Every structure is written in structure tokens, then in C-alpha cells.
Amino acid sequence: MNMTMKLNKLFSIIAISVAAVSCSDFLNLSDPNAVTTANYYTSLTDIQNSVNGVYAVLKEGNFMGSSACYFEENKARFLTFPDTGVGGGENAQFDNCTVQAGNQMVLSRWNAIYKCIDRANVVLKHIDDIKYSSADVRSQLEAEVRFVRALCYYTLVCDWGPVPVVLSKIETLDGVNKANVRQPKETVYQAIFDDCEFVVSSKLPDLQTAANCGRASKVAAEALWAKAALQMATDEDFAAKKEELCKTAITQLTAAWSKKPFGDFKNVDLEEIWDVDKQATAAEGIFQLVFIGGSNSANSSYNTQFRPTDINDPAKEVNGKASSGSHFMPFNKTTSLYNEAGDLRMSKLIARGSHKGSDTYYTLKYRDLDPSGYYGCNNVVLRYADVALMLAEAYYHSNQTAKAQEYLNMVRNRAGLPSVTPTGTALRDAIYTERWREFVYEFKAFSDMKRGYTKAEMLDLMKKDGATEYDNTDYYLPIPHTQHILNPDGLYQNPGY
């Protein structure tokens, strides 16, 4: 096996970057006709294209594409996948809390995230290969890829805990061996904080224009920084740092909130962010994955994944009697979650359907009736409802009850619900219930649950919800088997797998 093959085999971080034709081209400089990263970057367009390639990986199915729901809503039991035989039963493992180390969806997610990191590192390595008309342009490009890299590491630490941390392009077998080692969670979080801090101090705009709603901004970095700080603060392993981390989260969230392009949140249109024709300009939007309707190469699959079969028939959409798509909301779970009369999210963003004769519910968030079947609905990764509810979380975890209630009620009032004044664990439950109501089908549920509840409490919640196979093993995903066996000591397996 030659060195290049070993690099590809040993570590998915050595994924081919958008700027390189192949690993052999990258390593073999003797070919005068080879296009390598060493001679590829000659213009601003080359750098910009590579930055676009970093963003592109976010859209891969098991990363932030439509299959991302398996790792969040399905694991948290807010969605279910009815066709248990698909993928050799691997899809159903997420519903049943029986995910195995050989699960190909887990491997696909791992590979996609590290491919995205690798592409970001390639851009950072070569960003100074060209000259810029303005230092601000360079700053913005670096900030964009560092935001995406931070988003990658946030997903990794939520899903797997300790993971390899790679902050520069790896080019040798020795470099791979040294990097192919799980680093402490604290190291992963620090990488996120460092990247977000760079973005916040960069020349990026506070918020992007509608035309650039799929690009990083300072507010996006502030929100991500805060989310990572909250995730760390509520991790039992970092109890001693909880107060400090919550202060960091409040600082970043307050900064993000101060830049909001609207007045009273109650007056922000609930449906606008999900209107395929308006979501790019929606006041609530912070960062989206952008798709193009009518395009057979740049369309999104969320609509087909989460909607009834007859998605282009408005009449059937209204009466809700079409067969549900591949992921739907269990009837009893939905009615118990949206159990307050007048909740506009239930009446405007959820519709009733049926699957094999049983009543169920599905989302209208990705509604798109494009007759071509190539849908343009975006994935809204960060929005201001998230900022408000994270402020409620941060204040709750800081024992500032009144402030937590204030931000909780902003979201409730916008949804047509009255203000409430719970305290103690009832306030905690109200905040996270509100998050599940607000963000269902937005790939946040299981990570949110980890922020609100201890491992013991999660075990109790899942068991009471009927997850008979759930145990503390399921708190993290397994390290993919094909990665673990390459370095059993450095890429040690998570407990129970």
C-alpha cells in the first residue's frame, strides 16, 4: 500500500479538498501537469471557490442534510422512521436506541464533518498565496471558514465527546498518526471558542444580507459561541466552570440580541422564516443552508423527507390525509408536546396526516410546492428564537429566574401562548419543552436535551417515553468501527459499544 492510500485509509481528515484534484496529485510534485494545492491558488476567485466548497459539505445528508434528524429528533424520540427495513435496518437503530459502531450513517456523518474541517484547513493554509485588494477581504474569508470549522467541532463534541482536533492541513503519514487521537472535550471546546472569537473580531458584517444569508456573520458566531459555552457549562464534567461559561454565553447572546433587525419579538412573523420565497429576507434569520428551487443539482431534499407523499397537492395538504413521508411525528407525542390551546406553531407549522391507517403529524416548515420536484427550502441553522431561548437557558443555569422567564415568554408570546412564571426545575422543564416545540425538525432536540438534563435524568426521561433499549451508552455515538480499528488506543471506543 503506497503512502497516499495509507493516508486515505488511516484518517478521513485527509479527505480530498475542493482545491485538489487527488491525493496523488497533492503529494507527487514531479508531474509538471499536476494541479496541486501548491499551485492552484492564483486568484481571489480560487480562494472564494474553495470557501464555497467548505460551506457545501454542510449540506451532506448525514451532516446537516435531511438525514441529520436521525441524530437529533429521532434519537430524542420526537420523530420516528416507519420503514424499519431501509438501509439494512440501520436507520431504525436511531429510533430504537440500538446504534452500532458499524452503522454506515454514523461513519458518513463522521467523514463528512472531517471532510469539511479538512477543506477549511486547506483554505487557511493557502489563504496568503494570493494578494488582496483589501485586508478586510482576507479577514472575511478566513472568518467564514473558521465559523464553519467551529460548527463542525460543535457537532463532533455533542455527538462523540472527545474527538481528534486538527487545526491545520495534514500532509504526511506521520502527521496523520499524531492527529488520529481523541483529544479531551475541553480542547475541542477551546478550538470552537478560538474560532468564534476570531469571527466576532473580524471584518464580517453583524448580519448578512438576504443574498448572503448562507454565509457566516458576527451574530452567527456569537450564537454558536454561546451554544458551545452552554453545552460545556451543562456537561457534568465541567461543573466547576459552569458559572464562568454561563457568563460567557450571556455575553455573546446579549451581543447577538442587541443586533437584531426587529423590535418586539412577538411581532416577528412566525411563518416567514419557513416561506420559501421569503426566508432569505426573514428578520429572524441568522444563518441558513441555501438551496435553489428548480435546480437538479442544488435543490434540497427536506421537503420530500419530511412531508406527505402528495406534497404537490394543496388540497391533500389541507385535509392532511396523504401518506406521511419517511419521518413523521408520532400522534400521541405530538399532542402531548403541543398541549396548550392556541399554540400557533401547531396550527400553522404542523399538519395532520396518516401512515398505514394510523393518525400522525408532519411539518410544514419545509413547505414547497414547486411542480418540478426540485425544492428550494433552506435549512435554518441559526435564528433569533434560538438566541432568545438560549438566553432563557443561560439565565436559568445562572439562577436568574426573572430574566429566564422574560426570554422564555418572548418565544411563548410570539407563538400565541400566555406568559408563565415557573421556578426551579419547573422553569427548566418549561424552557426545554419550549425549545422542542419551537425547533422540531431543525436538528437540535437531542443536543438540547443534554443541556437541560443530567445523564441520570435523561435515562429516566427516555425510559418513561418508551425507549426501553436506551441506556447511558446512547448518550454519545460510537466511534465508527473502521476508524477505531486503525488506532484502538488513540481512537478508543465510547463505553458500551
What are these regions (language model features)?
Residues 1-32:
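Bacterial Sec-dependent N-terminal signal peptides
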Residues 22-24, 55, 63, 79-80, ...:
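Long, intrinsically disordered, low-complexity segments
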Residues 24-90, 167, 189, 193-202, ...:
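An aromatic- and glycine-enriched ligand-binding surface/loop that stacks and positions planar moieties
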Residues 48-62, 86-160, 182-190, 196-211, ...:
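Conserved, well-structured interaction surfaces
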Residues 86, 91-97, 326-383, 496:
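Flexible, polar/acidic helix-loop-strand segments at domain edges
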